[in-house]
């Protein structure tokens, strides 16, 4: 490639290190290009080979998860979201992703853009979002910084979701010292589409036009993917410009324009510009289609003066899409987006050479092989060193007999203390900031239902959806904790009257270069896989968020599960936890071989009343769990159950108390 006249910094190994690349990765890049990269090319490689985009430290482990099922219409990771056939010619697109690092430095915008980004993943596939969920983790509420983060995150989720017009119907909030300084903000979206009317994130057809549509591009979010691929430190506050800024009203326009364009048949391929922006969408679409692209990025609508091609390619400005369409459909495509008062600018066209070529006022500033950049192609894949953490010997050696017995006189005060602990207490302050009823499809929302139930209009069917994970269990027993995370999410869906179909996941862990962290990661994923196979809930995709650490240490390993279930008849089968009538019989449904065990390890009782995180996760057998869930679902469908509530945080005492309170 000829030298450019554009004034860019000379690329050196030291500059590559500053971009988060290792010495080996820099050497691979130079070898593949056959020359020293340009500054723009370095930026492209650094974000595409970041952990956030390449999954280089996790993909080998993720491939061990069950990723096939009769109802799955696309494989895990093949599209922007998972797609599940629910019958009657309908499919559900759903996905969960993290926005942890942005929310740690700018909680309002970090959380808001997390909501916006996951919605785009859904409607980019042609599905209309029908509900949102979230899963949140914070440090103790007596810390002013934690209260600031908590308030900002909840307001960000509420303001964006409410303005966008999709109900936030379910979620979970946990507090623990391990999350202090590094909150977890996981956002999930669910949408419905007719089978056969979906769009794909692919670039095909030599000569087809490539358009950028939606908002103008600014400097917000540059290197956001790289920022998400490193530990949070005192220097992270200086990376506030790496946090994107969202506009839910523009996103609403983009939703309608995108769905109209897909229905009009003018879209060959389309992808949201999320992490790494134009770089990621152009490279991934090209690689998937075995094609290339020629992009003239000076044509990108810009909202800031003096932007460089490096900045334009790496910007993560929100509410933007990359669209491929046939030349004969360009006028229609432009008319649709302009009708919705959105930009639609032609950047170039699809080529057959497999390379993404970036031009700046006619000058070639980047020429990179798409396949070499992407996950599943030439992006690095690492198998990290593992070591069983020493702390597990200490926690496993804990003797529950050292915990004082609870006197009868102290039982009621202890229950009240449990009910008042932040992890069990009502989250009404949170969900009252969310519009849970917009679009009028919410049958069971936050509060008395173990999972949310959302009606599919024009059908008797509904969707039961839930996010769930007990990070304390995973910390104490990673494999069993991973199993329980899947099982409890499925159990919640069953308690609401739904049949679990599939999961999406958001795997929140510490630094993968630490052998103990990677051992826990592999064990937890192994447990998840075992539970998914046993319960028949394949993995449709999701997200890995590493580097959730701060100067005080790593967060609890938190593999958040987003569970999708189908309620065959929302009027007859939807079930809540609230007791319905005096005189109803209260039963504890359990395996036939069940016996009482002193399962206080990792319990909220130990944590809230004794300040302890110790012992083993509760006794758990997958076959028994499956039998209980199948039995309960059968009883609900037979009309024999008036309410159902799973026994989890706080045990049977809290379970019964909550059913009374909900009544």
Short names for language-model regions:
Residues 1-663:
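Glycine/proline-enriched, intrinsically flexible loops and inter-domain linkers
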